[in-house]
UniProtKB/Swiss-Prot annotation:
Its EC number is 2.7.7.6. This is DNA-directed RNA polymerase subunit beta. Belongs to the RNA polymerase beta chain family. PANTHER family: DNA-DIRECTED RNA POLYMERASE I SUBUNIT 2. The lineage of its organism: Bacteria, Pseudomonadati, Pseudomonadota, Gammaproteobacteria, Vibrionales. GO terms for cellular component: DNA-directed RNA polymerase complex.
Amino acid sequence: MVYSYTEKKRIRKDFGKRPQVLDIPYLLSIQLDSFTKFIEQDPEGQYGLEAAFRSVFPIQSYNGNSKLEYVSYNLREPEFDVKECQIRGVTYSAPLRVKLRLVVYDKDAPANTVKDIKEQEVYMGEIPLMTDNGTFVINGTERVIVSQLHRSPGVFFDSDKGKTHSSGKVLYNARVIPYRGSWLDFEFDPKDNLFVRIDRRRKLPATIILRALNKTTEEILDLFFDKVVFEVKDQTLMMELIPERLRGETATFDIEANGKVYVEAGRRITARHIRQLTKDDITHIEVPVDYIVGKVASHDYVNEDTGEIIIAANQEFSLEDLANLSQAGYKKIEVLFTNDLDHGAYISDTLRADSTVDRLSALVEIYRMMRPGEPPTKEAAEALFESLFFSEERYDLSTVGRMKFNSSIGRDNDEGAGVLDETDIIEVMRKLIDIRNGIGEVDDIDHLGNRRIRSVGEMAENQFRVGLVRVERAVRERLSLGDLDAIMPQDLINAKPISAAVKEFFGSSQLSQFMDQNNPLSEVTHKRRISALGPGGLTRERAGFEVRDVHATHYGRLCPIETPEGPNIGLINSLSAFAQCNEYGFLETPYRRVVDGQVTDQVDYLSAIEEGTFVIAQANAVLTEEGTFADELIIARQKGESGLHPREHIQYMDVATNQVVSVAASLIPFLEHDDANRALMGANMQRQAVPTLKADKPLVGTGIERNVAVDSGVTAVAKRGGVVQSVDASRIVIKVNEDELVPGEAGIDIYNLTKYTRSNQNTCINQRPTVLPGEPVTRGDVLADGPSTDLGELALGQNMRIAFMPWNGYNFEDSILVSERVVQEDRFTTIHIQELSCVARDTKLGSEEITADIPNVGEAALSKLDESGIVYIGAEVKGGDILVGKVTPKGETQLTPEEKLLRAIFGEKASDVKDSSLRVPNSVSGTIIDVQVFTRDGVEKDKRALEIEQMQLKEAKKDITEEFQILEGGLLARVRTLLVAAGVSEVKLDAMDRKQWLEITLDDEAQQNQLEQLAEQYDELKAEFDKKFETKRRKITQGDDLAPGVLKIVKVYLAVKRRIQPGDKMAGRHGNKGVISKINPVEDMPYDEKGQPVDIVLNPLGVPSRMNIGQILEVHMGLAAKGVGDKINQMLKEQQELHKFRNFLQKVYDLGETRQEVDIAALSDDEVRTLIKNLRGGLPIATPIFDGAPEASIKELLKLVDLPESGQLKLFDGRTGDAFERPVTVGYMYMLKLNHLVDDKMHARSTGSYSLVTQQPLGGKAQFGGQRFGEMEVWALEAYGAAYTLQEMLTVKSDDVNGRTKMYKNIVDGDHRMEPGMPESFNVLLKEIRSLGINIELEDEE
């Protein structure tokens, strides 16, 4: 393996054995690819905006005199970049301009003579853009559009599994689902008639649809039935025999031919009889005359002389009819072939139930069903039926739908229109009848071949089309009404409906969600989430058990582990690590192809449909050196079932062991030893981990930590290789390698880092450089760590030394005992940033003012404000402190005579304003880290706003100047090299001003050209930077676009440092969660023989019943990993030579039979020193899931670092110094602090707000509510007979309004009595009864 310079700084020991065939693909590609497809120009017009425009345009006017055509579109540059949008609270979007062509025809001239053509670019609203990390900034907050898993368009055959009818009879149905348009359902009823429903309305006999398609009874019967021919010969009735049709029937008469009896009457006809009949080549047999009675005529039989119908199609024969037929001279009679086994007479029966006789009556019947109450006319009925399934504007199966439809009804091709035609409808009915006849299977709707993914791009396109269709109507009208000579395309288009539709989708759709930004993993998982809910999807209430369950086709596509607990379980899923979407929106997963038992490195992506019948081996199948299977029988999957298969039959093999699960689940080491329920909790809780002050890489990881950290976008990653030129806390400058340069550029990359900004969850986002000046970097190296990353690896928590033992009941019921040392070392200290904003509005009584001059407020309260009334940066504030002083005008009040007198004497002007300042919420204290003032255009900026503006300008100028100097330096260095090469002396150059170098003339023409080129570049660079600064200056100084009626907004950012404390929730990665019960002095904690105390004591009883044994293995492995670090520290202490370190490290990295090859000898001395420095805290270990370190390796590593192989140490009680009875499991576990902090939850109320109707106290911390004394709590008081307590609870402590005010007065007076009155809910009940029209009144006792 080749490690880059930064990867060599800390090499993670990998215990994986299987070779890595395929790297994990870019984790956010599902979002980015989909959106790119949406906004990129698509010449075919299949996808995205292009498809939407082409589907709506051209728009013809009603009279046909003009039309509006679409030419092309382009997206301009967005006005603000992502960061500016977040600060200003606006949407990151680009204006969409569309080139339209208005064609006007000359109505007097012959048809299609063009009179006038006008082209123009028209503004069509703003399209929100996706940031590089797959999010959208909507109104200043980052949002994610979650992909939706919905039922694919196409046709589905299903059954009710015998649940509808009491008899338990299975009723089959077929449903044609288009991408947009009306649903078409066919279904059987218990009497085996076939019915049709349109859009789930009332059912009609299915043959009505066929009649509406202009089919006669005869044609309908012809489509669905085979015929049986009878011949009348000399008073006997001969039947044409197809032996196969008789199988399973009971003979009602002797079947004989040529004097030989084949089957006697009353016997069942078997396959043996049929073989004999076929062998003897019997084609006709004689049947009794009454055999034809009850059979059904296949077409009309007419008496040719009189013209009367003897028997109509679909009518049953009687003996009389037979006589009439032979009289009319019919020698051959055709009847329908039906039987009870596999040729049911369903359509024939349905036709009898169908009251319609021709096309018109059928159309009228459909019209009545769709539009009840409207009088049907022939034209209306025809137009409605036509628009239901045959009009491209109203109905579209989409390419996916057509593909699924054709494959479902057995066509080989994918071609076909987006609308249905008559053969489509007939084929669906045929297949449904076949299924009812026992031929073919019903579909499994939970199969991933029948459910597809709708991602951002597709949903945005649909919304955009909705907006366009609204515009289309308006355009049509304007085209018909307006004066076409004067009108331009932009007069026709109103962009409002389009931007409204798009805005509504991004702002308030159920699938547009506030991004979960707790840590990098939660961001990545949120973007990879697949939801079955949302518009056009399921609802929680309706979703049954089957939809939520894990299906065999989820393998490698959707994670079977990561899903929420609670009502959404199974409806919200996560994409598996290697899964991706194909062009139709179905999920695919990669497999290695196996050819003749040889496993190749060729990787094929298969969707659930394609995977169908392949035999697929698992990733951990044992292979030989040559890449063939070692065992005779291999565990493999086929059609969703696992079993043993001979090795010659294997066709594919999994690519990786973590292919099955999602990213979050593959971060859990030793997942294979955990119970599924706990693994689910572990995967979900990692997403809730709060980034700690100092990130600490997990000692025991799984090897994909780096992928998550890099792909999440929280780190700064090198775009190109080079050498680090300079580094400070907020900027990294890299001189790019010569071979990666684009001709004609300065060759300097500048990375600006994000400092202390607030995330969506109020955690802190901050980037810290990890590289030093002079270090080489390659493309893709991590230059700066973000939140929860450590040297480019995901680091959600801290490695804690833990012991599994009870400790005085402090770890009862999953509680956690923590050492004080953890608090002192700030191991779990987190920073939370809150944004508090103060808005000054224009009110009816005058405008509010932000000022330090606040009535009735003492000096002390104003001490932290500046003269503009805004708190200064760096102030430490606590609950109740004023952050922004604001006064609101209040209406003139009537003064009492006394007040008037005082005013007259002291001449004091009435203070007609009230204090409405922004204060710190009660439970919060912290430091002010930033203040931003937004002022409306045209309102004068206050002093503070101007100060902030000056500061921003200064910063911007400094940034831009520095950037310019860096780039200028790079360019001038190239000039110097050129000049020196041309023979100019260096001394002379150093004496000159550097800019004069560009004016030197050289003799060599080629060199002179080069120099002139560089000079040109220099001028361009300067001009570009001047322009850049001007743009920046304009943005900073211009007024802000605030909501109507708002004059000024002041945003104050408050940083709160939260140490860990009792009541905080912590968890491991294996679903082992608990709450801190006590923080114990370090001297009381158990310690080992070396005197090392443990940090955390966990309850051993939390392990066996929960079956998450992975945590025990993690603890042992963690102990060994830390042991390596201790050993290195010991060697450093003894000041051993470098070669001994090399030998020790080589021994460590060579341990176990793994795929990883680390050659310490190949590292330089400096690299080894850096590695040693980074391994002092312990050796990071990767144990990939399902391919992790075996027990033997853990023991081997423990032995190498001189620790007991049992992983158990002798511990001593910190309080007494006595040893505990038996050895205790001690080791290192990766613990997370979850975002469920006691500070956010702790809350108490004495009196507060009450609900308006019931007058009961509100609930919840946000409303300063009380605790609910519910039904069960009432039972408890009843059970104890505590009558007075109960009375108090139900009256004065709840909704007895008079009682509670009196009670409060009494308490204030020191009189502790209560007088219960009438609870308000009783009055509410009275009102409700009266509202039902029953007069109910209270009678007083007196």
